[in-house]
A protein has these predicted regions:
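Residues in soluble alpha-helical coiled-coils and helical-bundle/repeat scaffolds
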Residues: 6, 52-56, 60, 78, ...
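Helix-turn-helix
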Residues: 14, 18-56, 60
Length: 224
């Protein structure tokens, strides 16, 4: 039976979502097309009807993951535009670290992205540049444009690396994992002009799940 255009679009979206989730959970090289198809509720044939290769699917899956991530990070908070503080709180949170399948694709797969093909590298570069742009907008007119670019590059790289490092040690040393996130959140906040206004990651630490979520909100910073 011929697949309708609407159904083909639905199938493509399901494959992209399934691939994005699995790649972040288990790595690009750790997932095969059979598993992706199964998670999407489709067959091999349906996957290859949409994508010529796993690499092509990965490129689209990462692009879609970046888009959804930036939408969450920069979404309005209680009717007001998101600030730099809001973005840092979201990215460098315990919840973001612990929910790998829906997290930033770069922080989830950073160690293996350099081994992938050029097309995926281009999507990753676009995603990284967009994160840098968000940081630059958050910095606003606090310094000259060239300096803002340097600060934004350092902030974006520290955020990605901080989440990745925090995850890497979490099973063996939850306390160290939490310390990494707190330290990166504080330093990145200082680089972004938040010195004295940072409460640390939001959510409950891995090693202290029974403790209540910390009260108090950081003072707002530049709107994005």
């Amino acid at each position: 039976m011929k697949v309708t255009k609407a159904k083909a679009t639905e199938n493509r979206a399901a494959l992209v979502q399934a691939a994005g989730s699995l790649f972040r959970e288990r790595g690009i090289d750790g997932v095969g097309v059979a598993e992706i198809s199964k998670k999407a509720g489709l067959t091999h044939g349906a996957l290859y009807a949409q994508f010529p290769s796993k690499e092509a699917l990965a490129a689209e899956a990462f692009a879609a993951a970046f888009k959804r991530g930036f939408e969450r990070m920069t979404a309005d908070r209680n009717g007001r535009p998101a600030t730099l503080t809001d973005c840092l709180d979201w990215y460098l949170s315990f919840d973001h670290r612990d929910n790998v399948a829906t997290s930033c694709a770069m922080s989830a797969c950073v160690s293996e992205l350099a081994r992938q093909d050029k097309v995926l590298s281009e999507r990753v570069t676009e995603g990284f540049e967009r994160l840098v742009a968000v940081m630059e907008r958050g910095l606003g007119a606090s310094s000259v444009k060239a300096e803002n670019r340097q600060r934004a590059l350092a902030m974006a790289a520290a955020m990605i690396g901080g989440v990745a490092a925090s995850r890497a040690v979490a099973k063996a040393d939850p306390k160290l994992s939490n310390q990494i996130l707190r330290a990166v959140r504080r330093i990145v906040g200082e680089v972004g002009g938040e010195e004295g206004q940072v409460d640390g990651p939001r959510g409950r630490p891995r090693a202290t799940r029974k403790r209540a979520r910390g009260a108090g909100s950081p003072a707002p910073s530049s709107q994005l």
